[in-house]
Regions:
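Short sequence motifs at beta-strands and strand-loop junctions characteristic
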Residues: 83, 144, 176-179, 229-236, ...
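A beta-strand signature from Gram-negative outer-membrane beta-barrel systems
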Residues: 123-170
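Hydrophobic, lipid-facing positions within transmembrane beta-strands of outer-membrane proteins
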Residues: 30, 87, 148-150, 167-169, ...
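Periplasmic-side early beta-strands and strand-to-turn transitions of outer-membrane beta-barrels
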Residues: 153, 178, 186, 190-279
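Outer-envelope beta-barrel architecture signal
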Residues: 99, 163-169, 174, 181, ...
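Short, acidic, small-residue-rich periplasmic hinge/interaction motif at the N-terminus
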Residues: 18-58, 66, 96, 133
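Face-selective signature of the C-terminal outer-membrane beta-barrel domain
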Residues: 244-262, 281-341
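Extracytoplasmic beta-strand/coil segments of soluble accessory domains associated
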Residues: 66-107
Length: 341
């Protein structure tokens, strides 16, 4: 019996060795999908980059762009005088003169002060806020950005519509301490499949009469009184109108018109219980800017930007001791800008 089993096993092994395998045969295997989470731009950037999107900006409960910028790491935001004062941003303690501010990819400039007041930009129509510590990876940035230590990019909203809803309207009303009133209105309209437009505006007013404790005298005979800050009122008006054209999948055009005006009281230092002040600062700024982008192929892309900017600033101090009885200074700025790459 054992001899028979050995013979059968030997014959089976010989048959297996003699059988040929078809190496040219194609074998089909089930499809395999390999996925990995998309790395955000902050991770892929060659220089340090911080970004706040629209949802994150809502969670910050910020009123102005300057309030949101304070949440970036390594940033110094100088606030000169509360809600109506000048607000500047500085990176790596190099000063506001070395930090560029971009509004929809085009430089914001102020030749009068040399510093951009980021407090005049609202968050109502901001879609994305980013801060580059160093040079940006965007090769289509203006030449001015290459001379800056950092870049604050403010990207406004791009309209999106549903198939059966060509109009979007949003209204907000904010109020707070010290007489703060801030209504705003936002409108998006789809004209056709290629053309759309947006319009938004806001008005903000506040008396700024915040309370403070005034102390005079030494520790043995200190005098304490409750006072309120005076001549700290502020009134701002901002409007924007934008037109968008998606001429094709590889061709886009954008046009924006912006207007801003403000009137702010400038309080004096309180000296011997005297805090009277009639100083006032008025600002007006308007600009029109346009961007055009065309992709010819995967290797060739053309982009051009143009801007016209006009600004006016007036400072008044009727109580200044001058030969003409007071101070009334006005400053004007007009700028034309064109960039192509």
């Amino acid at each position: 019996m054992s001899v028979l089993l050995c013979c059968q096993a030997l014959s089976l092994s010989l048959f297996a060795q003699q059988q040929k395998v078809d190496t040219a045969h194609i074998y089909s295997i089930p499809e395999i999908i390999v996925s990995d989470p998309y790395q955000t731009r902050e991770v892929r950037s060659a220089s340090p980059l911080q970004v706040f999107n629209k949802e994150e900006l809502k969670n910050l409960q910020a009123l102005q762009v300057s309030d949101a910028v304070k949440h970036f790491a390594g940033v110094t935001v100088k606030d000169y005088g509360g809600i109506g004062g000048l607000k500047t941003v500085s990176i790596r303690s190099l000063g506001a003169q070395h930090t560029a501010v971009s509004y929809d990819g085009i430089t914001v400039s102020d030749c009068q002060t040399g510093q951009v007041d980021i407090g005049r930009f609202s968050l109502n129509n901001v879609d994305r806020l980013s801060l580059n510590n160093g040079q940006s990876d965007n090769i289509f940035q203006p030449a001015r950005f290459f001379a800056s230590a950092g870049i604050l990019n403010i990207q406004t909203l791009t309209p999106h519509f549903k198939e059966d809803k060509p109009t979007n309207i949003a209204a907000e009303f904010k109020t707070g301490s010290w007489g703060l009133v801030n209504p705003s209105l936002f409108l998006e309209q789809q004209l056709n499949k290629k053309w759309s437009m947006t319009a938004n505006g806001e008005w903000m007013s506040s008396d700024g009469h915040y309370p403070f404790t005034l102390r005079y005298g030494n520790d043995a005979d200190v005098q304490v009184s409750k006072e309120k800050r005076r001549n700290t009122d502020v009134e701002n008006l901002r409007t924007e109108i934008s037109a968008f054209a998606n001429l094709s999948d590889k061709e886009q055009w954008r046009l924006k018109a912006y207007y801003y005006q403000s009137s702010r009281g400038l309080p004096n230092a309180t000296t011997l219980y005297y805090d009277f002040s009639r100083q006032n600062l008025r600002d007006k700024n308007t600009f029109i800017q346009s961007q055009y982008k065309k992709e010819f192929s995967r290797k060739w892309v053309f982009q051009t930007s143009a801007k016209w900017n006009w600004s006016y600033q007036n400072y008044q101090d009727p109580d200044a001791l001058t030969s003409v009885g007071g101070t009334d200074n006005s400053y004007y700025q007009q700028e034309y800008y064109l960039s192509a790459s």
